Amino acid sequence: MLPSQEASKLYHEHYMRNSRAIGVLWAIFTICFAIINVVVFIQPYWVGDSVSTPKPGYFGLFHYCVGSGLAGRELTCRGSFTDFSTIPSSAFKAAAFFVLLSMVLILGCITCFALFFFCNTATVYKICAWMQLLAALCLVLGCMIFPDGWDAETIRDMCGAKTGKYSLGDCSVRWAYILAIIGILNALILSFLAFVLGNRQTDLLQEELKQENKDFVGTTVSSVLRPGGDVSGWGVLPCPVAHTQGP
């Protein structure tokens, strides 16, 4: 084997080990993002009360709990995604839809992991990358649309008269909203990494095909040529000598 071929083989083995390790980490963080997506969709802790709010309570995408404002901290909870009429704002409905779509996309991406056993690795990486990018986009839309519903009467009763669109008044942002923003960054990084892994797999496949073609040509030529340089099957033909007869 030529030195260049040995170097190429070593590079290929080294890259395959590293790509498998990176791919495993990518899959683990994809599952983590899916968990984040499910949590931020279900949990009602997107915005909540503070020490100066007229009433205690907290709001999510579709589920919310608000107190009466009297002594005690008893909360009345309402809202269900299956019953849109219980959601206090159309902006909340739209935000819930986009976050749900993001959750469906990332769960579909995890389902596509099974394709690694049947399809080309580069193709699967690129499919997952697009799904993660779309999931991030849907989550961005959900986070941007959600504050548009802060002027709903139910939220104004809890957060005070200063509350309006994109203004929480006396209320504050809770951990689920922050977790959704972290999830967006996570999804964008995962999508970029999947595109890189997919493109590298494509380049590696092309290099392997080129190397196989070179090896095939070299093997064919070496099998045709003899060690001494003669072409196999072509013997040295005797030179015909003209015999002249005497007078």
UniProtKB/Swiss-Prot annotation:
Function: Plays a role in the regulation of inhibitory synapse formation and function by being involved in maintening gamma-aminobutyric acid receptors (GABAARs) clustering and their associated scaffold proteins at inhibitory synaptic sites. Acts in concert with NLGN2 to recruit or stabilize GABAARs.
Transmembrane segments: 22-42, 97-117, 127-147, 178-198
Pfam families: L_HMGIC_fpl
Disruption phenotype: Contradictory results have been described and may be due to differences in the methods used for gene disruption. No visible phenotype, mice are viable and fertile until adulthood. However cultured hippocampal neurons from deficient mice shown a dramatic decrease in both amplitude and frequency of miniature inhibitory postsynaptic currents (mIPSC). In contrast, deficient mice exhibit profound impairment of inhibitory synapse formation, prominent motor behavioral deficits and premature death.
Localization, UniProt: Cell projection, Dendrite; Postsynaptic cell membrane
MF GO annotations: GABA receptor binding
GO cellular component: a single term: dendrite
Subunit structure: Interacts with GABA(A) receptor subunits. Interacts with GABRB3. Interacts with GABRA2. Interacts with GABRG2. Interacts with GABRA1. Identified in a complex of 720 kDa composed of LHFPL4, NLGN2, GABRA1, GABRB2, GABRG2 and GABRB3. Interacts with NLGN2; leading to mutual regulation of protein level and synaptic clustering.
Location, primary (coarse class): other
Name by which UniProt lists this protein: LHFPL tetraspan subfamily member 4 protein
UniProt KW Cell membrane keyword: yes
